[in-house]
Regions:
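C-terminal regulatory or interaction extensions
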Residues: 1-272
Length: 272
């Protein structure tokens, strides 16, 4: 079938409720439904595979979908001059210039290099692992996308930041924020660091280390706790409820015999 029809059919096959379920996440008033696999990302990856594959090698573009990941592979390694480290910064030379021009003029793909930017951009915005090219070799490009959301707080943080801006942060800004979230402080672009600092998106700590702004920390869920009661004590109370319909002071005294005094048991009851 023609590519224009085939790409829609491939996405329809991938985007089934059972194979591409929505991930429901919430924190306070914030509620988002995030697809396991982002349509923009997957379409761009497939079209990149079509545009950059080697047509001198008789091999199909292979798409494998699993519950937690999708892999897309195409014949031929990276185009000349492109590798894992510079894939976002170098302008690649297409293997088929005419095919690439057709895809660009029909609006199916972005101009050279922009498609990869889009894949990284959406993965970071949804707090998913970055596109993984680690299994690529001289004979094939192998690209993997993971479904799992790594950090819900970061997702909420990025949504709020971008939605409040007239000029959106670009993919390099997002990459820097993502590295700081992971505790990576080496090889960061000083110009981007200064930009993010001025916009109060990061904090500069001692020893040239960085952390995300307090706004990010507000989205980190707080662990529920009862002041003055240890987790071990709560576990013992939970075990009591498994064997008793109700718990009296005497029951707790038996449970904590030799561990807590009567006064401490009364104090425990008052705090629960």
């Amino acid at each position: 079938e023609p590519l224009f029809i085939g790409i829609d059919k491939v996405w329809s096959y991938i985007n089934q409720p059972a194979s591409n379920p929505l991930l429901h996440i919430s924190e306070g008033p914030y509620i988002y439904d995030v697809p396991s696999f982002n349509e923009e990302v997957i379409r761009e990856a497939i079209l990149n595979a079509v545009a950059h594959r080697s047509y001198q090698i008789q091999s199909d573009i292979v798409i494998k979908q699993y519950p937690d990941e999708i892999t897309i592979s195409n014949a031929g390694g990276f185009p000349i001059g492109v590798d894992i480290n510079n894939i976002l910064t170098v302008n690649s030379i297409p293997r088929s210039k005419r095919l690439t021009e057709i895809l660009q003029k029909t609006g199916l793909v972005e101009r050279s290099g922009q498609g990869v930017d889009k894949m990284f951009y959406y993965c970071i915005m949804e707090s998913k692992p970055l596109p993984d090219y680690s299994k690529t070799d001289a004979y094939q490009v192998n690209l993997t996308f993971q479904a799992a959301i790594q950090d819900k707080a970061f997702l909420f943080f990025m949504k709020e930041v971008q939605e409040s801006r007239a000029e959106k942060l670009n993919v390099f800004d997002l990459l820097t924020l993502d590295k700081i979230r992971k505790g990576i402080n080496d090889s960061l672009d000083p110009n981007i660091i200064e930009k993010l600092r001025k916009e109060q998106l990061i904090t500069v700590n001692e020893g040239t280390t960085y952390s995300l702004a307090d706004k990010y920390k507000q989205f980190i869920p707080r662990k529920e706790s009862i002041k003055g009661v240890t987790s071990q004590q709560l576990q013992k109370v939970n075990e009591c409820f498994k064997t008793h319909d109700s718990i009296s002071k005497s029951t707790l005294m038996e449970t904590f015999n030799g561990v807590l005094t009567e006064k401490q048991v009364r104090n425990l009851i008052s705090r629960m």
